[in-house]
């Protein structure tokens, strides 16, 4: 954990035990200014003080440093993203020159954890996935660790790390070429459920992991067993579903949704599951989408279903039957940057809202606010923004709900 996360844990435990900073300082024989510095992330307590500090709160040192059922685990794909700018639009037997090339740590795990670490650096974050024993794998691990994201859940294998090649052309937009690489080697057995102390575990890009769908005699598939075990460990489970050629089949989803607390999906994915044209044509009213969301809930989802159309409309239906919607101001075409990773951006915002127990409508607003930051040129010049700035951006782009 970084100093901000440790400080937040100390402050939370101190308040839970009805101690002032001065009272805690007296117990530890330090100044109250020292306690204040810890809680504001300006430094760590000395190692020799940790047992005494944990005893004062009635917790273990591990709970103090890792948080007691705190944080978010993100399980999904890991890719090394190469963005190549070229000087001509590709065409058969044509040639284009690469004018610049940049590498990033990509995939749903990197995208979501990086976003959350910038939105709220006090949240402990855990990454789970699979990379190769190669330069790309080492690069991804180092980038995650630089953001104080725990990487002990990432498995390294003797297979190339997954790679995304994004070719940015002068006028034809961006082309994505993907190699799944080591992601296909990721096995549910790599997830040590019973050592996790997070509050929420989120799964994304499930179709990239064929081993997750291997048969399990008791639960139908291995993924269902993992989700069940997480819920048994008092950890909320969340699932992202996208619509593409490799989207999970309805019979596969039926095996796992009964062990999901929350499901986030695109309108296209919802339409695919329910065999309708939702997401493929303009939406005239919300009755049809609410009816389809109810069908997903009826498959066993235990708390909430979220559905999003692009970066500006969101819906939520919870198990109690409460339905709400939110529409953000659409981003002007001249300000629109890109849409790659948009689902991960929305998931980041929703996970933040779920983690902090926001009302459903506020979760939708925050998810769309994070998306607005991501796709708008005037906001994303420095990457994701902290919570206070996202709230300000939401206020600058009024919602219609």
Predicted regions located by residue number:
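DNA major-groove recognition helix of helix-turn-helix/homeodomain DNA-binding modules
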Residues: 48-63
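Alpha-helical residues within the helix-turn-helix
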Residues: 15, 26, 55
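Short alpha-helical DNA-recognition segment
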Residues: 18-37
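Ribokinase/PfkB-type carbohydrate-kinase core domain
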Residues: 70-78, 141-156, 168-329, 381-401
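Glycine-rich phosphate/adenosyl-contacting loop at the front of the ribokinase-like
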Residues: 63-128, 135-142, 331-340, 401
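Residues within the helices of the helix-turn-helix
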Residues: 11, 22, 51
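A short, Lys/Arg-rich alpha-helix, primarily the initiator
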Residues: 1-16
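Conserved post-catalytic alpha-helical subdomain immediately downstream of the catalytic base
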Residues: 299-304, 330-398
């Amino acid at each position: 954990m970084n100093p901000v996360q440790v400080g937040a844990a100390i402050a939370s435990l101190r308040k839970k035990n009805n101690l002032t900073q001065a009272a805690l300082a007296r117990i530890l024989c330090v100044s109250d200014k020292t306690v204040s510095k810890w809680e504001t992330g300006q430094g760590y307590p000395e190692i020799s003080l940790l047992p005494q500090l944990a005893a004062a709160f009635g917790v273990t040192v591990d709970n103090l440093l890792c948080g007691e059922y705190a944080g978010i685990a993100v399980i999904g794909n890991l890719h090394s993203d190469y963005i190549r700018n070229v000087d001509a639009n590709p065409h058969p037997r044509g040639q284009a020159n690469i004018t610049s090339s940049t590498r990033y740590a990509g995939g749903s795990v990197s995208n979501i954890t990086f976003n959350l670490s910038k939105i709220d650096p006090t949240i402990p974050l855990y990454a789970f996935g699979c990379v190769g024993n190669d330069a790309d794998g080492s690069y991804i691990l180092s980038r995650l660790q630089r953001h104080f994201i725990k990487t002990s859940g990432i498995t390294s294998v003797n297979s190339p790390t997954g790679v995304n090649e994004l070719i940015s052309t002068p006028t034809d937009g961006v082309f994505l070429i993907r190699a799944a690489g080591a992601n296909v080697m990721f096995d549910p057995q790599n997830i040590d459920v019973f050592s996790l102390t997070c509050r929420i575990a989120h799964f994304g890009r499930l179709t990239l992991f064929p081993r997750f769908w291997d048969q399990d005699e008791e639960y139908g598939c291995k993924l269902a067993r993992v989700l069940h075990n997480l819920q048994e460990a008092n950890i909320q489970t969340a699932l992202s579903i996208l619509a593409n050629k490799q989207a999970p089949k309805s019979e596969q989803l039926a095996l796992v949704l009964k062990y999901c607390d929350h499901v986030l999906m695109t309108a296209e994915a919802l339409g695919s599951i329910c065999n309708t044209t939702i997401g493929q044509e303009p939406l005239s009213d919300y009755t049809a989408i609410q009816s389809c969301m109810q069908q997903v809930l009826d498959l066993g989802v235990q708390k909430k279903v979220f559905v999003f159309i692009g970066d500006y409309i969101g819906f939520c239906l919870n198990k109690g039957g409460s339905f709400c919607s939110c529409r953000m101001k659409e981003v002007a075409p001249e300000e629109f940057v890109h849409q790659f990773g948009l689902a991960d951006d929305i998931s980041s915002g929703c996970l933040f809202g779920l983690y902090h127990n926001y009302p459903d409508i506020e979760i939708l607003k925050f998810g769309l606010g994070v998306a607005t930051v991501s796709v708008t040129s005037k906001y994303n010049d420095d990457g994701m923004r902290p919570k206070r700035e996202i709230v300000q951006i939401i206020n600058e782009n009024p919602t219609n709900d």
